[in-house]
Amino acid sequence: MRFMEEEFYKIFKGAGLIKTLIRSIFLTNRNKFSKPSKTKPIQLTECIGCGLCVDVCPTNAIKIFSFRETICSVCGTCVDVCPNNAIIKDRFTIDADKCTKCGVCVLFCPIPIIKKEIPKPKTPVILKDRCNSCGLCECEAIDIINKEINPEKCKLCLSCIEKCPLQAILTPDEYINSLIVKVDIDSCIFCRECEEICPIRGNYEHRES
């Protein structure tokens, strides 16, 4: 009996049947999991510029697309709502001299990307109504009397923001965000007082007429 077992094993080993059986049982569907040669191209017409793919990509292979060339749908809404005519329609650029950073164009833009086009201040911004001229920041770039930051002297170290006890200094990005109106719809009683004091309300009435 033992002789027959040894001979049977030699036959299997010599013919490679064991390996063949393993391949046929476990590796039959291997081709189904093969890596595709190329990634499916991005459908720019369907992209809303949310940036989620950029956040989750483990190899940082995806980058935010160019604003004017691919994402903007050229709807012109931002041009229509700008109270100071600061947005030029031919290339959807923003005139930094006219832009008051009111954020109205951001509220109306169906694809929330124009916010990146709003001109940002070159230095942190001091909120004068909060600043008490404490002088804790020893940086020569800060004018304590006028509560302003000299862009030529500021090194953007942001140490002034960390030291300010009243949180009266904002980064350029924080400053832009603070200008955009946010309404708590649960707390709003629809008194419309905000409309009465809004400085650009007259411009909207002029556009509607």
From Swiss-Prot:
Name of the protein this chain belongs to: Uncharacterized polyferredoxin-like protein MJ0934
Molecular function per GO: 4 iron, 4 sulfur cluster binding; metal ion binding; oxidoreductase activity
Give the binding site residues for [4Fe-4S] cluster. Answer: 47, 50, 53, 57, 72, 75, 78, 82, 99, 102, 105, 109, 154, 157, 160, 164, 188, 191, 194, 198
Q: What sequence ranges are listed for the domain 4Fe-4S ferredoxin-type?
A: 38-67, 63-92, 90-119, 122-151, 145-174, 179-209
| Keyword terms, alphabetized | 4Fe-4S, Electron transport, Iron, Iron-sulfur, Metal-binding, Repeat, Transport
Quick check: keyword Nucleotide-binding in the entry?
no
The record, for Pfam families, names: Fer4, Fer4_10
Query: Does the record carry Metal-binding as a key word?
Result: yes
